[in-house]
Design a protein with these regions (language model features):
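Residue(s) in the substrate-gating loop at a strand-loop-helix junction
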Residues: 1-257, 263
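Catalytic core segments in nucleotide and nucleic-acid processing enzymes
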Residues: 1-31, 257-417
Length: 417
């Protein structure tokens, strides 16, 4: 049985070659993957890898690397279980991940990786589709038939059937299950079968393939997914297709002629934090007269647009929230961030804006007015909020975080000069 190895690291940490089963072949594979993605995932050193703000999971052959988020600069090793749970819950809430009961149990036992959860999600969706009954579609098929139907491919017919007068080489329509949707799902099943060897999911995957129709092997690309038909008949397939897309487009077999099979499911933690806060604020504002918008944009210069992370609209008044996934400690916000908030206030006619950072403890000390060039008394202002992402137990995510942020924004101003 193939032995699977697992490494857990934090974002912005350094993983040295030779450390914790991370070998030169893994380093080379990661460097090639990084080049394919415009060097955005890692910084490469001569002796290892420095991870950036991307979190998630990588698998190179039998080595799985989980990249976990963190707030503090130096996060203890023993907190990795807590931060894995944070990442899973954030992905779940933002609908990038779904955990089934078996997966939930395994997560609690720390016997499962993030990649296993994605694989299990996909297999459960395909199993459900098989149980409901896989759809048939019309599709074109080219080959030899014994009765003339469809379009005769004359040149190939002469070439192949000169000695077989009873055959016809045609392109014709077939009504069956070997269509593009099932071919895409079949490719994802093959990838999971390959990468799950030695894990508890491998047997489940092999069993599922026995119930899945035999379909033509394809190598799906980004354009393949744009060709998939959409209809009410196909609606039950949407989740399975979206997971298949994530798996297929992030799978790199024999990357740049190497021998390692690799899959990378990585998420920008800045964007994930933004989406997470947006959802929590929407949840908190359901019973209030507050409209919440994400990535509302306005033209800034020529074709350049600006878009704050979150815009709140209440009684025709707008408020701005911009999220930053970084711990600034006791430091002031950067000049760049303050300029950004000033421009947002000006363009959205907002009286106040909030820079929002994650923290271990809540800290909000009101708003400070921007200095007015024309001595305007009611100049707009900006606040700095550090919000605890955990409940008091410091292990579970605070599901009331949205209410806390709304309270900072909507209550009477506490203004400092």
């Amino acid at each position: 049985m193939i032995s699977h190895k697992r490494i857990q690291v934090y974002e912005h940490s350094f993983l040295r070659i030779g450390e914790r089963d991370f070998d030169t072949k893994h380093f080379i594979a990661l460097s090639k993957l990084n080049a394919l993605h415009n060097y955005q995932y890692f910084d490469l050193k001569h002796n290892g890898v420095v991870f950036k703000q991307f979190v998630g999971v990588l698998q190179v052959d039998n080595l799985t690397i989980e990249i976990l988020p963190k707030i503090d600069r130096y996060e203890p090793e023993e907190n990795k279980k807590k931060w894995q749970s944070v990442l899973i819950e954030m992905l779940h809430l933002t609908k990038k991940l779904k955990i089934h009961e078996a997966g939930q149990t395994n997560v609690a036992r720390q016997s499962i990786t993030l990649l296993d959860i994605y694989f299990e999600w996909f297999l459960s969706e395909v199993q459900l589709l098989i149980h409901q009954g896989l759809i048939k579609q019309y599709y074109k098929q080219t080959g030899n038939v014994k009765a003339l139907k469809g379009k005769l491919e004359f040149a190939i017919h002469i070439q192949k059937n000169l000695a077989h007068k009873e055959r016809f080489y045609t392109t014709h329509q077939v009504y069956g299950k070997d269509h593009l949707i099932h071919q895409v799902l079949g490719q994802a099943l093959d990838i999971i079968t390959n990468l799950s060897k030695g894990s508890y999911l491998h047997a489940k995957c092999k069993t599922l393939k026995l119930d899945f129709p035999e379909v033509k092997s394809i190598n799906a690309t980004e354009s393949t997914f744009t060709k998939l038909p959409r209809s009410r008949k196909n609606a039950p397939y949407e989740t399975a297709i979206s997971i298949a897309r994530l798996i297929i487009l992030n799978y790199a077999p024999n990357i740049s002629k190497g021998t390692e099979k690799m899959l990378a499911l990585l998420f920008d933690m800045n964007k994930l934090w933004e989406e997470y806060i947006l959802i929590r604020i929407k949840q908190a504002s359901k019973d209030n007269n507050i409209q919440v918008y994400g990535q509302n944009s306005k033209t800034f210069w020529r074709n350049v647009s600006i878009h704050p992370d979150i815009v709140l609209l209440c009684d025709k008044e707008q408020f701005i929230i911009d999220t930053k996934w970084k711990n600034i400690g006791n430091n002031k916000p950067s000049i760049h961030d303050l300029r950004q908030m000033y421009v947002y206030n000006e363009y959205w006619k907002s009286s106040k804006s909030l820079l929002l950072y994650p923290s271990s403890n809540d800290d909000f000390d009101g708003y400070i007015r921007f200095v007015s060039l024309d001595n305007t008394a009611d100049q707009h202002k900006c606040g700095l909020g550090k919000v605890s992402i955990f409940k008091d137990c410091n292990t579970l995510l605070n599901d009331q975080i949205g209410s806390k942020i709304l309270n900072w924004i909507m209550n009477e101003d506490k203004i400092r000069v």
